[in-house]
From Swiss-Prot:
Residues joined by cross-link Glycyl lysine isopeptide (Lys-Gly) (interchain with G-Cter in SUMO2): 3, 57, 96, 111, 131, 242
Protein name, entry field: SWI/SNF-related matrix-associated actin-dependent regulator of chromatin subfamily E member 1
SMART domains found in the cross-reference section: HMG
DNA-binding region in chain numbering: 31-99
Subcellular location: Nucleus
Post-translational modification: Ubiquitinated by TRIP12, leading to its degradation by the proteasome. Ubiquitination is prevented upon interaction between TRIP12 and SMARCC1.
Length: 376
């Protein structure tokens, strides 16, 4: 990762070498610190995450692993915590053995002697500087290839810097000051427990929301699939009901319909003609009856007229016979008047008879008697 891991030991200072040849020895290698639980998990899954995300940077991969670590349950994290605690106990025992080892004790003695020599040399140099004496003398170089510019202010500052860092590293080393992260107070534990509870509540809430979202999604998906199936079924049904247009069949149906319409029209015309004939046939018998009645009445009228004519003929013969015997002009005139009166009476009777016949004939108002019959 980009930052230096917190579990790595502080860098050991480089051995300081003064112009007088005093060298501070390097300490022996201490035992390695145990890996923190997160770093154990990171080392375990690093290659897997790197293989699945080859294009990501190191800090992005570390961010992904951090999220995976936070998502682990307490039971899964406990495995790494147990390993860390076991190795930490071994590390403390190794550190005790390391501090009591002959190499470390020799390093402490050599270090103290070198520091004492350096302090003595620095005091002497300081005193010479206060007295104004030069702190070094120029002598001819025995080896021209061995170039030495002397003990400058830069070298002094470097020595002081390294010394200060050594002191700070010794003061703040684990052998003196315990790691703050390894010491958990009761108040801190209570705070952590409350944080864990709040995080668990928040996690359960998020899980419930995720379940609701998933249920809604599944419901929408189900409705969408159902609507799709119904649409496809309806489409198939409509495609099955598709009617192919056959122009020849349509033309045949049109011709058949026209033929049926023509036949119905002929039937209607025929029915109308038959009805007219029936109406005329019903009128003709009535006219015949009326004509027969008129003829009968005429015959009845003709009979009295014939009797009258015979009577008139008899009277005329009698008159002629009388005239032949004893006829007078006055008798002739009276006889002629009697004939005329008889004719007038006959004509009046015939007129009354014709009027009665016309009254009986005029019963059907729709069919008047023809003029020829009236004339007869």
């Amino acid at each position: 990762m980009s930052k230096r891991p917190s579990y790595a030991p502080p860098p050991t200072p480089a051995p300081a070498t003064a112009s007088s040849g005093i060298t501070i020895p390097k300490p022996p290698k201490p035992p390695d610190k145990p890996l923190m639980p997160y770093m154990r998990y990171s080392r375990k899954v690093w290659d897997q995450v790197k293989a699945s995300n080859p294009d990501l940077k190191l800090w992005e991969i570390g961010k992904i692993i951090g999220g995976m670590w936070r998502d682990l349950t307490d039971e899964e994290k406990q495995e790494y915590l147990n390993e860390y605690e076991a190795e930490k106990i071994e590390y403390n025992e190794s550190m005790k053995a390391y501090h009591n080892s002959p190499a470390y004790l020799a390093y402490i003695n050599a270090k103290s002697r070198a520091e004492a020599a350096l302090e003595e040399e620095s005091r002497q140099r300081q005193s010479r500087m206060e007295k104004g004496e030069p702190y070094m003398s120029i002598q001819p170089a025995e080896d021209p290839d061995d170039y030495d510019d002397g003990f400058s202010m830069k070298h002094t500052a470097t020595a002081r810097f390294q010394r200060n860092h050594r002191l700070i590293s010794e003061i703040l080393s684990e052998s003196v000051v315990p790691d703050v992260r390894s010491v958990v107070t009761t108040a801190r534990m209570q705070v952590l427990k409350r944080q864990v509870q709040s995080l668990m509540v928040h996690q359960r809430k998020l899980e419930a929301e995720l379940l609701q979202i998933e249920e809604r999604h599944q419901e929408k998906k189900r409705k969408f699939l159902e609507s799709t199936d119904s649409f496809n079924n309806e489409l198939k049904r409509l495609c099955g009901l598709k009617v192919e247009v056959d122009m020849e069949k349509i033309a045949a149906e049109i011709a058949q319909a026209e033929e049926q319409a023509r036949k119905r029209q002929e039937e209607r015309e025929k029915e109308a003609a038959e009805q007219a004939e029936r109406s005329q046939g019903s009128i003709a018998p009535e006219e015949e009856q009326v004509a027969n009645k008129a003829e009968e009445k005429k015959d009845e009228e003709n009979i009295p007229m014939e009797t009258e004519e015979t009577h008139l003929e008899d009277t005329a013969e009698n008159q002629q016979n009388g005239e032949e015997g004893t006829s007078t002009p006055e008798d002739k005139e009276s006889g002629q008047e009697g004939v005329d009166s008889m004719e007038v009476e006959g004509t009046s009777d015939s007129n009354t008879g014709s009027e009665s016949n016309s009254a009986t004939v005029e019963e059907p108002p729709t069919d008047p008697v023809p003029e020829d019959e009236k004339k007869e």
